[in-house]
Amino acid sequence: MPPVSEVDRGPVEESSGGLKRSDCVCPVCLEIFLEPVTLPCMHTFCKPCFLETVDKSNMCCPLCRKRVSTWARLNSRNKTLVNMELWRRIQDAFPSQCERRVQGIDDDEEAVMIPKPRVCQPGELRKEYEDQISKLVEEKRALEEAERRASEEYIQRLLAEEEERLEEERRRREEQQLENDEKLARLLSLELNSGPASESTCNIKPAEATPAKKKPSVGDIEKFLRPVPHRQPSSSDSSPDSSLMANKENILSPPKPLSALSAEDCGKLTVHMLECNGKPSTSSFNPSTSEHTFVFNTPKSSSVKRKSSEIELQSEVDLHSKRPCALLRFDSSSEDSPFLSEVAVHEEALRSRWQQEEEDRRLALRIQKELDRENSVDRRKGSADSYQLRQKNTSVSTTTSPDVEGTKKGSNTTTAKNCTGRRGEEKTEKRLSGTTPGKRPGVKTPVSSTAVSSTVKKGTKQTTLTEMFPNMGS
């Protein structure tokens, strides 16, 4: 058996001009070209096939669907549709086939155009398979690398955003803390400068004042925020100092009005923390007392020299670390004792009044609970306020009058009288039940209705017809 590569299923004709039969076959009719027409898209058809498929239908190439309407109309008018050069070459290469095609004679032998099969070389399939596998692995590796890189970038971006957010929150908290510290320092300075000095603070002028446009140094606010260790009160500490430290939380309490102080007290006021422009004092922070000169524009004197005691501040923690609210201690002169003592007395009075109001409120709540407990009504059976129920039939039968017993004995003798009596009683009861609820206050009630009301007022829950109508028994 010959090898597969040597099998030849049909002849393959090739002319001397270099044209193959496969190149001269129309893709529509699968015959050799007859007056070939070459379109602008370089696809060639027979002229009859072109006229049937292109010219009469949609004016598009059957293979590539390119629009050729303008080209077809122009060449049809000029009669240049047929590619004469290709037609001449086909006639020179295949004269017999062209002659039979022109005469309309079909070819007896059909040329089978099957290419010769080719056997693969040893290892060619394995190499092709390995190349395909390596290509797929490389593509997968590249895809995984791209995904990993994208995930790393995304994680880095998330971490950066989180870090920025935390940094922003920390910066915001620090700014808020600084604002709170600054507000607290201002409140402390206003508390110390308020009261008697409310009118004169704006007129205070230091003797050795710096220029007005001098900017405050950065970080001066820290000296008002340093915590001071608790010390045992000594003889030098006066009672107003201790009262002010005990009531440091009541900073926002209304200050004493200026009208309560005299002009002499205003002149003797000493400024402890800040100057009139709100800037911290430029004096050093040593325990010793330094002398400052201030000008007070009071009604009595225009300029008076006063001594002010320096603020004693001691820090035990780092300035950059977080710390609680600063505790300020200072040595006040004897001239401040009336004002501070009055403030302490006023706060003590307010506290005592609040305690008394709280005790009164608790007492009122306790009394109200006792009253609610006393006013509650017990409706259980057997209690004093229980619901009044109807009495049993046995009690009703025992309370009947002798007239009723005589009537019952007479009724038992004759059946006819008993029936008529019962019917009369039923009619009377129905008439009574129909007329009693609808009676009007202006109409006089009979004696029987008065008897019924009297029996109801006595407290009985059920009565008989003879008690309601005593005239019937007689």
From Swiss-Prot:
Signal peptide span per the entry?
none
The protein's annotated catalytic reaction(s) are:
S-ubiquitinyl-[E2 ubiquitin-conjugating enzyme]-L-cysteine + [acceptor protein]-L-lysine = [E2 ubiquitin-conjugating enzyme]-L-cysteine + N(6)-ubiquitinyl-[acceptor protein]-L-lysine
Zn finger limits (RING-type): 26-65
List all disulphide bridges recorded for this chain. Answer: none
Compartments it resides in: Nucleus
Renumbered ranges of motif MIU motif 1:
174-195
Keywords of the record = Chromatin regulator, DNA damage, DNA repair, Metal-binding, Nucleus, Transferase, Ubl conjugation pathway, Zinc, Zinc-finger
- The residue ranges flagged as biased composition, category Polar residues, are 192-203, 385-402, 409-418
UMI motif: where is this motif? 152-160
Motif LR motif 2: positions? 379-390
Q: Tell me a GO cellular component.
A: ubiquitin ligase complex
| Enzyme Commission number, as recorded | 2.3.2.27
Explain the purpose of this protein: E3 ubiquitin-protein ligase required for accumulation of repair proteins to sites of DNA damage. Acts with ube2n/ubc13 to amplify the rnf8-dependent histone ubiquitination. Recruited to sites of DNA damage at double-strand breaks (DSBs) by binding to ubiquitinated histone H2A and ubiquitinates histone H2A and H2AX, leading to amplify the rnf8-dependent H2A ubiquitination and promoting the formation of 'Lys-63'-linked ubiquitin conjugates. This leads to concentrate ubiquitinated histones H2A and H2AX at DNA lesions.
The written remark on domains in the entry is:
The MIU motif (motif interacting with ubiquitin) mediates the interaction with both 'Lys-48'- and 'Lys-63'-linked ubiquitin chains. The UMI motif mediates interaction with ubiquitin with a preference for 'Lys-63'-linked ubiquitin. The specificity for different types of ubiquitin is mediated by juxtaposition of ubiquitin-binding motifs (MIU and UMI motifs) with LR motifs (LRMs).
- Subunit relationships: Monomer.
What's the protein here called? Answer: E3 ubiquitin-protein ligase rnf168
